[in-house]
Amino acid sequence: MATGKSGGSSAEDLGHHAGYYRLPNTHDARLFYFFFESRGSKGEDDPVVIWLTGGPGCSSELALFYENGPFHIADNMSLVWNDFGWDQESNLIYVDQPTGTGFSYSSNPRDTRHDEAGVSNDLYAFLQAFFTEHPNFAKNDFYITGESYAGHYIPAFASRVYKGNKNSEGIHINLKGFAIGNGLTDPAIQYKAYTDYSLDMGLITKSQFNRINKIVPTCELAIKLCGTSGTISCLGAYVVCNLIFSSIETIIGKKNYYDIRKPCVGSLCYDLSNMEKFLQLKSVRESLGVGDIQFVSCSPTVYQAMLLDWMRNLEVGIPELLENDIKVLIYAGEYDLICNWLGNSRWVNSMEWSGKEAFVSSSEEPFTVDGKEAGILKSYGPLSFLKVHDAGHMVPMDQPKVALEMLMRWTSGNLSNASSSFQRLDFTM
C-alpha cells in the first residue's frame, strides 16, 4: 500500500503490508490486517504491538488513520506521515475483527462470533498465521493494545495467548503485556460509575443523579444473573443497564459522549468521511486486495451478534496474568463519558491479586511529557493506571505525543519512576 508516498517508494520498501489470513478451524473466515514495520532506530528488534478497536464491530482502520497509525488522510485523499505513529517505536499490526468487521468477512454465517471464547480463538489463530509468515518477528516482545470494547477482547485474548504458550500449542508468542485505553472491562463497577462521573463533571444535577441511580441496583442484579446463568439474562442486563447511560445521554443532548468538551457530529460523533472516501477509492482497494467487499466503519451485524457478551466481567482473567508478570496498563482520557476514567480506576483498584493492597496504597505521581504534567499515574509491580489529561475516549487522537511516550516508556519498563525501582526488587517487567 504505497498511495500518496513521496519519492514513489513501494509499500514493501517501507515495510508496509496488508492482506488476509484465512482462519483454520472456521468455515471460511478471513481476517484483514495491516502490518507496519517499525520506523524506530531498533527497527526489526522493536516490540510487536497489535491494536484492536472496539465497537464491538468497529474497524481498526479508525485507529490507523485517526489515532496512532503511520499516517493520516488529508482532504485531497493523500496520506500524510503521522509524527506520533506507534510504528515509531513498534512493529505495528491492526486487525479487523471479529469476522464481519471492516474488510474481514466469511461466506458462512456460522463464523459470526457471539462471545470472547470465539473471538480470542480467532485472534490466536490469526497470530499463528502472522508469525508463520513473519518468523523473524516471533522472538520479539509482544504487546496487545486497544480501546473501548477491546476492554473485553484484550483480557480474553491475552489469556488465550498465555494458555497457548503454556500448552505449547503453536509458535511461542513472547507476550509481555497488554494495555487497554478507555475500555469496558467490568460492567458492574463501570455502569455504576456513570452517574458519579456525570455529577462530578456537571453533566447532571443532584436530583437527576438521584433519579437515575434508582436503576443501579436492578442493573447490578441483572449483571450478577448474567454472570451465573448466561444467555437471556445477559440480554436483560444489557437492556436494563443501558437505561442508566441513555438517561444521561438524553440529558446531555448533542454533547459528544466520547469527549464531553465537544459536540457529537455524525453517527459515530466524529467526522470520519475522509477514511470512508479513501477506502472506497479503486486504487486503494486494488492495492489492499479487498475486491468489492463493502467497508463499514462499524458493523451493526457484529454489534448485535455480541450483545450477550456485553455485560460479562472480563476482569476475572487478569489476576492470573499479573501473577505471571504480564504487564497490565489501563489508561483513560479524563473527558470520556462512555468508558470513563472513574469506572476504570474503580475496577482496577478493586481487583483481587497478590499486589492489590500495595497497588491501592501506592501514591499517585505526575506523568510528565516535555516537562508538563500530561496525566496522573499509579503503579505497583506489573500493574499501572494512567489518567490522561486533556483527552477523551481516543487518547492517541487527542494527545498523540503523550500516547506515543506512554507506549515507549511502558514497553521499555520505565512508565513510572516508582515501578522501575520496584522492578529490581521483585518483578521482571
Curated annotation (Swiss-Prot):
Q: Which Pfam families match?
A: Peptidase_S10
Going by the record, the broad EC class of this enzyme is: hydrolase
Q: Which GO terms describe its molecular function?
A: serine-type carboxypeptidase activity
Q: What are its E.C. numbers?
A: 3.4.16.-
Provide the binding site for substrate: C339
The family database entries (Gene3D superfamilies) matched by this protein are listed as:
alpha/beta hydrolase
- Identify the glycosylated residues: N76, N414, N417
Q: Which GO terms describe its cellular component?
A: endoplasmic reticulum membrane; peroxisome; vacuole
Q: In which tissues is it expressed?
A: Abundant in germinated embryos composed of leaf, root, and scutellum.
Keyword Metal-binding: yes or no? no
The record's keywords, sorted A to Z, are: Carboxypeptidase, Disulfide bond, Glycoprotein, Hydrolase, Protease, Signal
Q: Which cysteines are joined by disulfide bonds?
A: C58-C298, C226-C241, C264-C269
The residues responsible for catalysis, as annotated, are S148, D336, H393
Q: Which GO terms describe its biological process?
A: proteolysis
Q: Which PANTHER family does this UniProt record tie to the protein?
A: SERINE CARBOXYPEPTIDASE-LIKE 49, SERINE PROTEASE FAMILY S10 SERINE CARBOXYPEPTIDASE
| Family in the record | Belongs to the peptidase S10 family.
Q: What is this protein called?
A: Serine carboxypeptidase-like
Organism annotation: Oryza sativa subsp. japonica (Rice)
